[in-house]
């Protein structure tokens, strides 16, 4: 029975989490509609509040009908439904990737707003097989070819309880229960490589899919038993991350690890230092690895970071001037700025703006800044790093740069910590 398989999966994935709330992402397609009905049964049995989230990407005429249909199903099940909208701003470059990131941003932000810790998605067995083929075409390594049934995004746990259930079983379940769903016409378009792979797999013999699943399991096992522990050791031994939001990599210690792990370390640092959520592609990281082997000092930019070799160390800090962080008003007690720093005010102040240091502001306060400590820690790269730090302004005046203990008056009311909003499935343990 499908439900029994689903129940076994979700109980194993969630464990003893003690949840009272959970959310499910539903588009209106067969996979997510089946997930909604299965999750509803499970939530009723376990007395858990289930919320339903739909995201309209505003790319197809049918999408609004799909959202309306999901809303009707949710109402019939007495479940709260939230309809979100992705604004593509008429920018169609790299649209699939941007739409995916936008979708997860919207859904996880909603989860955070309502204290929901877990989001269910409808990735099923066929999706895993297709992903494996796509990544194999891109020459992905062990980490890229591996799969996970639990991921993290924006500090929300993303769980995939259909991971070992083929699409055919989900469709059969819906048909047997007389449940309708929508077909996304883009799934039949040759415009997308995934669709071409799906068609080839459908025409192939059943043993091909079985062999891919077996290879996936072997890779996952290799990752869990060899490469994940090596990655954790490498980060502990070779990486130093500083409160100023930059990092040093010890290249002597770094050299002893496998190439697979080296790529992941560089990507790990690029993500947390840049404040981005997505990893750089291997072809972008590879030139840096080659430069490291040449044993010469260099300075490059990659993934929103400056990567600079200084003797036997690699310095990585945020690139200033490219995609500058947004200014934010500190209305609550604390706020995350640039996806990297948590700023907390210890007492009531007039509305403060958290932003970056402009050249004009720097010239005004330059003589009052004590950068000695930052200079020592960063091997004299203090001026560049200074412009990546959060500053606090009131009425366009810089009143504080907490990292370097600069305050315009005696009231030291702010605390700043480096708290990048990123969790890796390779370094996080539930």
From Swiss-Prot:
Top class in the EC scheme: ligase
Gene Ontology biological process terms in this record: tRNA modification
tRNA processing is among the record's keywords: yes
Keywords: ATP-binding, Cytoplasm, Ligase, Nucleotide-binding, tRNA processing
Positions of transmembrane segments: none
An example Gene Ontology CC term for this record: cytoplasm
Function description: Ligates lysine onto the cytidine present at position 34 of the AUA codon-specific tRNA(Ile) that contains the anticodon CAU, in an ATP-dependent manner. Cytidine is converted to lysidine, thus changing the amino acid specificity of the tRNA from methionine to isoleucine.
Written domain comment of the UniProt record: The N-terminal region contains the highly conserved SGGXDS motif, predicted to be a P-loop motif involved in ATP binding.
Full protein name: tRNA(Ile)-lysidine synthase
Organism: Rickettsia akari (strain Hartford)
Gene name of the record: tilS
């Amino acid at each position: 029975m499908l439900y029994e398989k689903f129940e076994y999966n979700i109980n194993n994935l969630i464990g003893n989490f003690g949840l009272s709330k959970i959310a499910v992402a539903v588009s209106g397609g067969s996979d997510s509609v089946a997930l909604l009905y299965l999750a509803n049964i499970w939530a009723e049995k376990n007395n858990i509040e289930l919320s339903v989230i739909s995201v309209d990407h505003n790319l197809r005429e049918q999408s609004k009908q799909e959202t309306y249909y999901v809303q009707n199903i949710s109402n019939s099940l007495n479940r709260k439904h939230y309809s979100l909208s992705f604004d593509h701003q008429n920018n169609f470059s790299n649209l699939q990737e941007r739409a995916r990131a936008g979708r997860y941003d919207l859904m996880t932000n909603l989860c955070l707003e309502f204290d929901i810790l877990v989001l269910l998605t409808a990735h099923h067995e066929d999706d895993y097989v297709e992903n494996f083929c796509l990544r194999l075409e891109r020459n992905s390594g062990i980490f890229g070819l591996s799969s996970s049934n639990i991921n993290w995004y924006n500090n929300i746990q993303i769980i995939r309880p259909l991971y070992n259930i083929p699409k055919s079983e989900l469709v059969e379940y819906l048909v047997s229960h007389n449940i309708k769903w929508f077909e996304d016409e883009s799934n039949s378009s040759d415009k997308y490589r995934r669709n071409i792979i799906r068609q080839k797999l459908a025409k192939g013999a059943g043993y091909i899919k079985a062999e891919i699943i077996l290879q996936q399991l072997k890779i996952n096992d290799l990752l869990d038993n060899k490469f994940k522990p090596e990655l954790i050791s490498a980060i502990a031994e070779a990486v130093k991350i500083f409160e100023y939001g930059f990092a040093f990599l010890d290249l002597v210690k770094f050299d002893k690890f496998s190439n697979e792990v080296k790529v992941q370390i560089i990507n790990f640092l690029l993500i947390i230092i840049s404040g981005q959520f997505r990893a750089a592609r291997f072809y972008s990281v590879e030139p840096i690895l080659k430069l490291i082997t040449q044993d010469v000092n260099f300075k490059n930019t990659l993934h929103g970071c400056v990567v600079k070799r200084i003797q036997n160390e690699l310095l990585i800090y945020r690139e200033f001037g490219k995609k500058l962080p947004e200014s934010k008003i500190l209305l609550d007690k604390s706020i995350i700025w640039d996806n990297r720093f948590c700023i907390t005010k210890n007492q009531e102040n007039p509305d403060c703006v958290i932003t970056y240091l402009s050249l004009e502001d720097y010239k005004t306060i330059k003589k009052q800044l004590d950068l000695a400590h930052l200079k020592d820690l960063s091997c004299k790269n203090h001026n560049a790093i200074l412009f990546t730090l959060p500053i606090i302004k009131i009425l366009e005046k810089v009143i504080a740069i907490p990292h370097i203990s600069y305050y315009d008056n005696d009231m030291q009311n702010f605390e700043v910590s480096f708290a990048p909003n990123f969790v890796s499935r390779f370094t996080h343990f539930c």
